[in-house]
Amino acid sequence: MQGAGLVFQVCSRLIIKGEKMKSRQKVFENIIHGIFLILGLVAVAAVLLISVYLIVSGIPAIRKIGLVNFLFGKEWQSTAADPKYGILPFILTSVYGTAGAVLVGTPIGFFTAVFLAKVAPKGVRRVVESAVGLLAGIPSVVYGLVGMLVLVPAIRSIFGVADGSGLLAAIIVLAIMVLPSIIKVSLNALEAVPKEYEEASLSLGATPIETYFRVSVPAAKSGITAAVVLGVGRAIGEAMAVIMVSGNAPNMPSLFESVRFLTTAVASEMSYASGLQRQALFSIALVLFLFIMLINAALNFFLKGKKEKN
């Protein structure tokens, strides 16, 4: 009987200890969940604060200038006696520059990712991945400096123009800058495709190249699309490198003439702007912010549609 009582006491103590451990673990998990919730709310709050600040700061200028005159006006003379605040040249330049950079950078980045994921030997892959990582870590001002000292004179010499600064130089620099994002995200998407898909395709008689482009790439389409959209966001939001190679003049977009992007318009004038000019620059920032939001919304819509189809 004493032995049975001792066993009962030991078991009771173990049960109590186990319950205490579970209680402590639950408290710890609740604390961790609370921390994650707070961090998530901080991120959401930051976006909301930025949105509200841009709206409050940017709307007054649009009201004074007029939405149509602001968005579709072709002249920007913010320091003139009779100032004009038309940002159509900035919008078109940003759209053309971003589109050109993505059109140039996407094929290069995509095929590089396919090569690294499916074809490249380990040694070659290691070298290329190191180079891509280095590209991602180079500051924007270095891209702009190299573009200004090397690319702009080259364009001037090759095409025989008075000044090599312009939209073409900006497109080339931006195309190089978006490469790391496109390559890395596309590479991760391709590597996430199950090996069974490729093995099944090869067993049915398909060649490796056919398997890569008819099986692996379609299966990784969502990730590759995300890579392109990230590249768009990177290109449309760049300022420092662009301001150094584009000429930064408020002209309508032209490959060989100085142009100004939405980002460079804000960066070049905000330091000395005041009054309506300063408000107009906040309005430009608001337009740029809305562009980025639309791009993200389009990406989420596309990815959601793909998931529902699958």
Q: What positions do the PLM features span?
A:
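Transmembrane alpha-helical segments of polytopic membrane transport and secretion proteins
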Residues: 1-40, 299-310
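Cytoplasmic-entry segments and transmembrane alpha-helices of multi-pass inner-membrane transporters
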Residues: 33, 108-147, 310
